[in-house]
């Protein structure tokens, strides 16, 4: 296993442990090859990508774009990219999603916050 792959596996495992400690039931799926469905499963309606890169900007960009394809493959409504911060606890990492997907999440969680039903995302 390459050094970078081992680093990613450690982060994914630590993230699963953290999410489970918060009451979720998540796990790392077997690698799916060309039909990637994300790094972590078990959060209903979500595809999850996890990045532990030195280049945080690149991790945000590539991971957030990548989770959109994983979302399609999984048939998930939402996608989130968890990005590790160096020398910080897992809980202090970033959870990144596209703004249009965030609006979809808000519509589901807080429908009363929207003025009417005509506020479709572009």
Positions of PLM-derived features:
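Catalytic phosphate/metal-binding cores of nucleic-acid and nucleotide-processing enzymes, i.e., regions
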Residues: 1-122
């Amino acid at each position: 296993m390459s050094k970078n792959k081992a680093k990613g596996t450690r982060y994914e495992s630590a993230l699963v442990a953290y999410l489970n400690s918060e009451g979720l039931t998540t796990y790392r799926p077997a690698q799916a090859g060309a039909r990637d469905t994300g790094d972590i499963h078990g959060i209903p309606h979500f595809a999850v990508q996890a990045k532990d890169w030195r280049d945080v900007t690149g991790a945000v960009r590539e991971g957030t774009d990548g989770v959109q394809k994983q979302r399609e493959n999984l048939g998930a409504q939402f996608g989130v990219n968890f990005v590790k911060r160096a020398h910080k606890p897992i809980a202090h990492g970033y959870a990144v999603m596209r703004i249009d997907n965030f609006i979809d999440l808000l519509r589901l969680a807080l429908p009363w916050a929207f003025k009417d039903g005509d506020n479709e995302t572009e």
